[in-house]
Amino acid sequence: MYKRQVDEFEKAIAQSQIIMFPGGFSAGDEPDGSAKFFATAFRNAKMKEAVEKLLNERDGLALGICNGFQALIKLGLVPYGEIRQQDAQSPTLTYNTINRHISKMVYTKVVSNKSPWLAQAKLGQTYCNPASHGEGRFVAPKEWLDKLFENGQVATQYVD
């Protein structure tokens, strides 16, 4: 990234309380889509420092929708809480088990409300939500899954 753009982003993050990574078929919705771009851009030392200050020193929030959630995972912000490289054991999003894109209404159940985003949600409450993705399957080793549930980092689960 150009120095001026990095400086502008750094300044904007320093003045923010929330950083939001959007989705919406950006980057042609290629595998990992815009998540690859976000992961590359935000690994810049200045950008990384700005995000980590936002989250750790100013109690800021991060949100990722669709490809934006992939970006949070690729950056390491989920589940590590810091920008870092992934390794073979890192959680990831991958292709749906049916090997094609889905677009339908799904039911999810709140299993943790520790996040400020869900502070008012009732545990066990079920919601009907639109879902549209080709890479919506979260994969992690069992020990990671157990840890994520134990820490309350899994907010919702699909239900029938």
Q: Which residues make up each language-model segment?
A:
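Amide-donor transfer/coupling interface in amidating biosynthetic enzymes
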Residues: 4-15, 48-55, 84-160
